[in-house]
Amino acid sequence: MMNELFGEFLGTLILILLGNGVVAGVVLPKTKSNSSGWIVITMGWGIAVAVAVFVSGKLSPAYLNPAVTIGVALKGGLPWASVLPYILAQFAGAMLGQILVWLQFKPHYEAEENAGNILATFSTGPAIKDTVSNLISEILGTFVLVLTIFALGLYDFQAGIGTFAVGTLIVGIGLSLGGTTGYALNPARDLGPRIMHSILPIPNKGDGDWSYAWIPVVGPVIGAALAVLVFSLF
């Protein structure tokens, strides 16, 4: 069990370090990759997911996502007694990963005066704030993610191909569905760094948009549950 928890912790740490690292590189001032755009962010997140799964896959199932963890438990693939420890490990990894992003880009954070840009390197936010639409966006994106992960399990792949497919899937979801909310798809990916945004001493950071914070938590869990329901028909 400890190996599995360490795998979930380490994998989620790598996920946030690389994923929010690319966001910081695109958004924060005076970086080499500043203003390189949404396609770079989606590609970066796809690579981040693939690398994180490769790193942690020998230690744990590499769920790295509370919504996926709950979905697997609903499907009967994980004992419910393991769900909370997995989620806690994922949140711990996400929070430490975000601290490393902050350390990596500290001079650039200090040069940034726009509070919205700073928050964007920690957590997601909607392009247009609309509670119902934003919630649907997170539900749909996570539904596609979890259903596809389950479907991939029906096929025999050579080692690593499934992981590459999931990374590609993240890019696809980001390009197709992610432009509305920034596609959290993962409660730990959003809430863990959002908590660190409130804690870390960053000039001009503003607030953490906590009125929105429930959507990237609840939406992915609903999406994962719907994916379990649909997959039961396969």
UniProtKB/Swiss-Prot annotation:
Disulfide bonds: none annotated. One of its GO terms (cellular component) is plasma membrane. GO terms for molecular function: glycerol channel activity. It is a multi-pass membrane protein. The keyword Transmembrane applies. A motif (NPA 1) lies at residues 65-67. A motif (NPA 2) lies at residues 186-188. It is found in: Cell membrane. The chain crosses the membrane at residues 9-29, 37-57, 61-81, 83-103, 135-155, 159-179, 214-234. It catalyses: glycerol(in) = glycerol(out). PANTHER family: AQUAPORIN OR AQUAGLYCEROPORIN RELATED, AQUAPORIN-9. Aquaporins contain two tandem repeats each containing three membrane-spanning domains and a pore-forming loop with the signature motif Asn-Pro-Ala (NPA). Mediates glycerol diffusion across the cytoplasmic membrane via a pore-type mechanism. This is Glycerol uptake facilitator protein.
